[in-house]
Amino acid sequence: MQRPENEPQIKAFFNAKEAQARQLVSMEKKELPPEIWPYFEAGKKGDWATVTNLYGKMASRSHQFDGNKSYDERMLTMAWNPINETDRFYLQCTQPDSNLVLKFGEEVMRLIPPGSIYFGDTDTGRFVPTALCRDHAKGDPFFVITQHAMADGLYLAYLRTMFEPRIYIPTLRDSQQAFDEYIQDAVKRMQQGKLQPGEDLKKEGNRVAVSGMTAIMAINSLISKVMFERNPNHQFYVCEGFPNAWIYPYAEPHGLIIKINRQKLDELNSEMIQKDRDYWHKQITPLIGDWIKEETTMTEICDFVEKVYVREDFTGFKGETNFTRMATFWRKVPAYNSASANWSKCRSAIAGIYVWRINDCAEQIRAIYRLSAEEMNKKQADIHRLTAEQQRYIKEADFAYRQAFALNPSSPEAVYRYASLLTSMGRQEEALQMARVAKKLNPALITLEADLIKAKLQTNPVITVTP
């Protein structure tokens, strides 16, 4: 087994997390699975084959993975979190593009002020900064948390042992209130036939059973909002995993990640937008070259994808070949782990902020048109302002999605989200052009191509694509 280049760093992380795990189990005083301490010992020694073997045995019995048929009560321990954090960091460091993955993590660290609360909601965005902290358990230099485990009571208990009383961690009561709030809203939508894909609700007597990724993420989101509201003296940042509706009114592009402002923003001003553009130009240039401009066409982007990603013809290419090659290995390396997928996902997330602003402007304009004629006439200046603002956001979302697609054209998220924007603007031909080249890298995108063709044949083409 090949040794990671930063092996001393990984060993040190195992050592720190073993000490934390021992402290956690001393509080729990319960029977533990036999693999825990040999796992940490193997990590400290650099015995990576044993680390992988023991982690696999524990993970197969952990509560974390749905549909686990060999569930082990002994795995219900807070020590599972240090185990998971060490293994996930080790995996990040053993990829062929691990130097770029670590560079991504280091950039996230640079962007976040000390004392902030940071939601790391992708594997790289969570586990690499966790390991790069001076002391993760002490929130030094900032508090690394994931929204995606907020509904897990064991994870919240783990956070409390580390971070209270310095920051407020949601309680079991907060979790229950979030669950009840979600159920109340979801039942109403179920009766109206408005459940979203990934929401599965079933009535079982007097109770409602919930399953599905969308439902779980919605509950996690409500709990994380409590955390935001109860920690008013801390800055918040997020590396987006799934779009989170409550964040958008507060969201501002902040380099690779998103800043969650304390107050809702009336707009994203020209200074914020220019700063975002300048930052991403500097990020993208060493990775895939300095060629994407505002006037760059979809044909030019698809030609680049065909040449560099599909044919791997690097003639005249001025970027990181390892970056682009890993984007084509989506079968072997999960897309959320590769460096190209991480940069692309972050750019898509920021494009999503602009899309939310587009829709918000549209809603404000619709609200004005619902007024009486007399009141509407008084709002003509607002209509012109909102229309101009909306066009500005459309331009930025379009450009950001083009960059996201060029960074990883095999990414379903980048392709689907951009296709949604293009079709909403009547640019189905461009969406279809993108889907046709993307499916060469990821055959799963054939479905999108079929949907786009079907929509194009309709008299009034309408398509809804969900990331």
Model-assigned labels for residue ranges:
Residues M1-D121, G125-L407, E413-A414, T423, ...:
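ER/secretory pathway lumenal C-terminal domains and tails of membrane proteins involved
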Residues E41, I353, L421, L452-N460:
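TPR/TPR-like alpha-solenoid repeats
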Residues A367, L371-E374, L432-P467:
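Terminal, low-structured helical/coil segments at or just beyond the last alpha-helical repeat
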Residues Y416-R417, Q428:
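Extended alpha-helical scaffolding segments
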Residues A349, R417, D451-L452:
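Canonical tetratricopeptide repeat
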